[in-house]
């Protein structure tokens, strides 16, 4: 995180359950999450890497780190946004994800864009 408001990136996440890609009898629950990353600062910046902590309903945690997102390292001008969708498989009906993106501004300043925890959950239906 960087306290200077010139280096600020906002992240919004919309998760959803993918019933057609899940096989609950085999302990496979598929979720997609759509992400909107917006440069809310004053300096253009590039997303360099991602860091995720994925926790299932049994408390098992997995760390996932990698370069960029969906094969890209998008550069965002002030006010510009980048959207992408990705997915995750859990062995339980619910879990959560949280993490951060490593960013580098055009002036060389490195900072972190936090991704607040969000819930992955199979929707309940009433019969």
UniProtKB/Swiss-Prot annotation:
InterPro entries associated with the record: ApaG_domain, ApaG_sf, Uncharacterised_ApaG
Coiled-coil annotated spans: none
Source taxon at top rank: Bacteria
Pfam family, any one: DUF525
SUPFAM superfamilies, per the entry: ApaG-like
ApaG domain sequence ranges: 3-127
Gene Ontology biological process terms in this record: error-free translesion synthesis
HAMAP family named in the record: ApaG
PANTHER family found in the cross-reference section: F-BOX ONLY PROTEIN 3, POLYMERASE DELTA-INTERACTING PROTEIN 2
Protein name: Protein ApaG
Organism of derivation: Xanthomonas oryzae pv. oryzae (strain KACC10331 / KXO85)
Lineage: Bacteria, Pseudomonadati, Pseudomonadota, Gammaproteobacteria, Lysobacterales
